[in-house]
């Protein structure tokens, strides 16, 4: 097993970004990294999400809803079925809804949604609210 990523106690929450749009994935990773509160990793090919998730051990996964090869719902189902990743919160990102609809609390299969293009403040807020360590705070 690849032990490149190891989650240590008191470590910053890890966010896995699965999006075939490399520009969005890079921008989201940069935003999260520069916030100083998170460590982010990107996956451009959704078929590598499970493998990367197992090694990166994320605390939260942002998944694009519409991707070639596998859509976000398929990726989410794989992550949820995996013993090591079951229970990790998943947030969908998509162009299929407006920011207003996302803020109104719309969900897909019980998962929160962020509208693309995402405002920086909306993305940071939903990440913080979705993390188990921060949701009750």
Question: PLM features: what roles do these ranges have?
Answer:
Residues 44-48, 71-77:
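Acidic catalytic/metal-coordinating carboxylates
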Residues 22-41:
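Two-component/phosphorelay signaling modules centered on CheY-like receiver
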Residues 68-69, 98:
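The feature encodes the CheY-like receiver
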Residues 42-60:
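Acidic, metal-coordinating helix/loop segments flanking the phosphotransfer/catalytic sites
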């Amino acid at each position: 097993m690849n032990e490149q990523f190891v989650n240590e106690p008191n470590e910053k929450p890890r966010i896995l970004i699965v999006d075939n749009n490399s520009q969005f994935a890079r921008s989201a990773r940069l935003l999260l990294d520069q916030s100083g509160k998170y460590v982010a990793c990107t996956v451009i090919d959704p078929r590598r999400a499970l493998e990367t998730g197992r090694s990166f051990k994320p605390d939260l996964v942002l998944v694009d809803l519409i991707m070639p090869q596998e859509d976000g719902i398929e990726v989410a189902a794989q992550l949820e079925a995996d013993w090591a990743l079951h229970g990790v919160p998943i947030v969908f990102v998509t162009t299929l809804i407006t920011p207003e609809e996302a803020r109104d609390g719309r969900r897909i299969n019980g998962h929160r949604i962020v509208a693309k293009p995402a405002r920086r403040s909306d993305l940071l807020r939903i990440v913080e609210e979705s993390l188990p360590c921060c949701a009750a705070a």
